[in-house]
Amino acid sequence: MPRSRINGNFIDKTFSIVANILLRIIPTTSGEKEAFTYYRDGMSAQSEGNYAEALQNYYEAMRLEIDPYDRSYILYNIGLIHTSNGEHTKALEYYFRALERNPFLPQAFNNMAVICHYRGEQAIRQGDSEIAEAWFDQAAEYWKQAIALTPGNYIEAQNWLKITRRFE
């Protein structure tokens, strides 16, 4: 039984119903429908914290999905899971791959900035201010890209950029 049919969450059920209706009325191939089913099941598992199951579904969706835009969201969600698991190098890789397919994902730029900022803070704790500054500079670049895509968002990042004099 597909995961979407066993999930008890009202929002997930509503999303599943709407998605199923759209899949019936929008002309798509069976491969696209199957890819979306795996993607939807991956999102459901991810929202419940079942990351291993979510990854399996996302990898299967990636195998089937051919549209670069849709693939970007699958890759982004894989990056989210790796971020949640503390696997920052892997997360960055997936965010980069998502952005290669869809450069208009401000949330990917934001998450990359957060990881770089975190690494900068780690470097400070280890007493390496030079490496910390490099990480903070990289975080600033990613936040600038996120802000350029969605100027009204990421207010905390905008404040950090101004306070640290990294905002142009």
From Swiss-Prot:
SMART domains attached here? TPR (SM00028)
Q: Is Cytoplasm given among the entry's keywords?
A: no
Biological source species: Eucalyptus globulus subsp. globulus (Tasmanian blue gum)
Where does the UniProt annotation locate this protein?
A: Plastid, Chloroplast thylakoid membrane
Q: What does this protein do?
A: Essential for the assembly of the photosystem I (PSI) complex. May act as a chaperone-like factor to guide the assembly of the PSI subunits.
Question: According to its record, how does it sit in the membrane?
Answer: Peripheral membrane protein
The residues the entry assigns to the signal sequence are none
**GO biological process terms on file:** photosynthesis
**Keyword Thylakoid annotated:** yes
Q: Which family is this sequence assigned to? A: Belongs to the Ycf3 family.
Kindly provide the name given to this protein in its UniProt entry: Photosystem I assembly protein Ycf3
Q: Which InterPro entries match?
A: PSI_Ycf3_assembly, TPR-like_helical_dom_sf, TPR_rpt, Ycf3/AcsC/BcsC/TPR_MFPF
The record's TPR repeats, renumbered to this chain, cover: 35-68, 72-105, 120-153
Gene Ontology cellular-component terms for this entry are: chloroplast thylakoid membrane
Q: Where do transmembrane segments lie in this chain?
A: none
For this UniProt record, give its keywords in alphabetical order, as a comma-separated list. Chloroplast, Membrane, Photosynthesis, Plastid, Repeat, Thylakoid, TPR repeat
